[in-house]
């Protein structure tokens, strides 16, 4: 029994020396205690039933292998390859059989080194293991597709409202915040899974490359199977990741445009306020000048009266009438009052 711990999962590999009479009957999995299997709280991602056969010169012929493969696998999805310079033949249809396992078979030449056989087995298990883990990302993006579509539509509506200018900036900002929050939540939830999927995909293709596949009897190779069945799913994951990033960029641009719109509106409001303040200041200045003029008249009136009262007794000695005296002192008094008020105002400023 071999146990391996990975970042997200663990693997259990059991090796049995004797081949069962009925290929892929799943009896080897009975070696795992049922109560132990039932006690596992984790989800089983994949299960591989790999059969290893060492062929004699006669049995290792292409016809015998082809006959066995036809009996063990579904022909429509069967992938077969000679690997590592023809030292072995690997095959699988990548389908789950009736007992819940994926079937792999490895035919090896009797002269093939045990270490090389072990490496081939390790690569085959890793191909299926990392393929299954990467498909978790495909399941995630399928569940995200509708939500991303809704966010895309909402962003389009927000941009349309901003273009029309009929919706208040506060309403647009509230809608944009809701969409941005939903988008950020979605991105945070999917970021790790999409990144892990990309890493797992790279491992799958790397493991297939190191097998150095050669075509067997015109059948599709593992790399060709992956290109037809696996790569489209991974391209969907990549395109969804790019789409998610584009949605985030659109939300950022929408926020920038809204900020620009608010700044322009605020600038226009400030300009209007400054214009209003200028008009008000001009009005206050004119009113101040009017009040100043009235103040000069009022003060001058009382000043002339006081000066007349003071000078009239003296003016009688010279036979000067009160009216003539008033007319003489009015202009000088008014001038003095005006100069006095101007001086007071200049000191206040």
Predicted feature locations:
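Ser/Thr/Asn(+Pro)-rich, low-complexity disordered segments
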Residues: 1-18
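Phosphate/adenylate-binding glycine loop and adjacent helical scaffold
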Residues: 2, 20, 28-32, 285, ...
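N-terminal juxtamembrane/topogenic regions of multi-pass membrane proteins
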Residues: 3, 80-88, 340, 345
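Extended alpha-helical interaction modules
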Residues: 15-177, 181
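Cytosol-facing regions at membranes
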Residues: 46, 84, 112-113, 157, ...
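Short, positively charged
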Residues: 96-112, 141-148, 152, 186-211, ...
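Membrane-associated alpha-helical segments
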Residues: 179-304
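Alpha-helical transmembrane anchor segments
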Residues: 282-349
């Amino acid at each position: 029994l071999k146990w391996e711990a990975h970042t997200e999962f663990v693997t259990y590999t059991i090796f049995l020396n004797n081949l069962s009479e009925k290929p892929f009957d799943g009896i080897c999995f009975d070696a795992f205690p049922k109560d132990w299997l039932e006690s596992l709280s984790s989800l089983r991602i994949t299960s591989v039933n790999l059969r290893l056969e060492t062929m004699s010169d006669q049995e290792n012929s292409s016809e015998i292998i082809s006959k066995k493969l036809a009996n063990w696998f579904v022909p429509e999805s069967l992938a077969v390859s000679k690997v590592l310079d023809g030292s072995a033949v690997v095959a699988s249809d990548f389908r789950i059989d009736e007992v819940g396992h994926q079937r792999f078979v490895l035919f090896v030449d009797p002269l093939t080194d045990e270490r090389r056989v072990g490496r081939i087995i390790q690569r085959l298990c890793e191909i299926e293991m990392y393929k299954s883990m990467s498909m978790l990302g495909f399941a995630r993006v399928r569940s995200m597709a509708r939500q991303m579509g809704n966010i895309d539509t909402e962003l389009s509506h927000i941009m349309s409202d901003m273009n029309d200018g009929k919706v208040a900036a506060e309403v647009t900002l509230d809608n944009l915040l809701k969409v941005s929050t939903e988008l950020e939540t979605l991105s945070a939830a999917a970021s790790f899974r999409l990144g892990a999927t990309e890493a797992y995909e790279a491992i799958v293709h790397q493991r297939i490359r190191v097998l150095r596949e050669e075509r067997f009897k015109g059948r599709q190779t593992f790399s060709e199977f992956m290109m037809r069945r696996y790569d489209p799913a991974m391209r969907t994951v990549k395109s969804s990741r790019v789409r998610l990033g584009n949605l985030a960029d659109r939300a950022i641009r929408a926020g920038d445009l809204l900020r620009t719109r608010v700044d322009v509106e605020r600038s226009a409001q400030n300009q209007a306020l400054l214009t209003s303040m200028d008009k008000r200041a001009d009005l206050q200045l004119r009113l101040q000048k009017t009040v100043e003029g009235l103040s000069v008249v009022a003060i001058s009136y009382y000043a002339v009266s006081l000066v007349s009262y003071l000078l009239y007794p003296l003016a009688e000695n010279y036979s000067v009438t009160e009216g003539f005296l008033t007319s003489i002192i009015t202009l000088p008094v008014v001038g003095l009052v005006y100069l006095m008020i101007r001086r007071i105002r200049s000191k206040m400023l």
